[in-house]
Amino acid sequence: NMVVFKQTLPHIPAMIEHISHGDGLKLQLIQFMPELVGQQEWMVDIDSLKKWLELRADKVLVREMHHRRIYLFNGAEVEVVDPVYNAEFCMNCHRIRVTHQGELKGCLNRNDDLIATRGLDDDGLRDAFRKVVANRVPFYGAHVKNFPRRDSRTAVPIEFPGLPAA
């Protein structure tokens, strides 16, 4: 896994080159989520990165979960996890997550829906799971309204210094 933001972006071609020589390696490029941690200026145009991958990959597949593209490079998989303002990701998400502190989380894009599980018995855990499912909100809700909307139709391939254009 590699979080994609301005400081890690230049290392992506080398990471892809590295995994393309391994057997069964997979690189998940995870979109930086400033709405959760701040630092919006670190954000990268993830759609431009996806265009770059699409132009260079040997083959592109589509995963059912989140309807994510899988870019194949010499058999190695590169997958972009891009949930920020991505309705397609949300529409195809059926996951409940568990945080490092054991809290249940119904949406990757939110931290205001956490349900504590510490100390719960079996019945309490069942109730917690039911509650997290009942509290799910499609497409993030309004709590991220201060961040720009995405339009992947206008994306152009990102350029990496020293690498030829596709």
Predicted regions and their residues:
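Radical SAM enzyme [4Fe-4S]-AdoMet core and its adjacent flexible, acidic
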Residues: 1-79, 83
